[in-house]
Structures are given as structure tokens and as C-alpha cells.
């Protein structure tokens, strides 16, 4: 299921960049107690007023879409992997970074 989360974030990044393209960066880091994954894009960014809703089921800014991808991603990360996912930063016209932190099993 975790692979699906990364796939969904990547597809959203492609959609955010549109036909002009851009860049997607996947950053993976390991610390003593956690694994960190960041998915960044150079897309249109998320408006401040929409940030609190991005993980809400049914919320979408796309013309086509159900608004379920990010809510399912959050559920998978939190309930199945006991981690956290959030928008690390987003700037309209410049892009967005989602961050996932997973605790390492000791």
C-alpha cells in the first residue's frame, strides 16, 4: 500500500505541473529512529485557503477527480504504517512538497 501512496503523490505532482511539465523530486532520508520521504514538484502549488482541506475526503481542485487520493494516502500512512503525512510547504506558482515520516521498528 505504501507504494500506492508514493504513486498517488507523484501523479498529483504531474497533474499540478500540467502540460508545460516541470520537475518532481523524491527525497528519501533515514535517521536513527525514522524514515523520511518527501515528494516535491514545481507545479502550481496549493492555495493557503485549501491547505487545511487537502486530506479531506471529497476535496479536489481538479476538473476530473473524486478527491479521494490524498485522504486514502493519509489513512494508509497513519493507520497501516503508524506514520505522519503533511504538506511541508507549498507556494502558489512554485510548487509543493509533501512529507511522510515513518517510525522505524526497533
List each language-model region with its residue ranges.
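Conserved polar catalytic motif of the HATPase_c/GHKL fold
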Residues: 7-12
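Short beta-strand/loop element within the Bergerat-fold HATPase_c
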Residues: 23-33
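Acidic ATP/Mg2+-coordinating residue in the GHKL
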Residues: 41
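Glycine-rich G1-box
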Residues: 44-45, 92
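Short conserved segment of the HATPase_c
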Residues: 46-57
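Short alpha-helical Gxxx[C/S/T] motif in the catalytic ATP-binding
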Residues: 69, 73
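Detector for a conserved hydrophobic position within an alpha-helical segment of the HATPase_c
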Residues: 77-78
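Glycine-rich ATP-binding loops of the HATPase_c
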Residues: 81-89
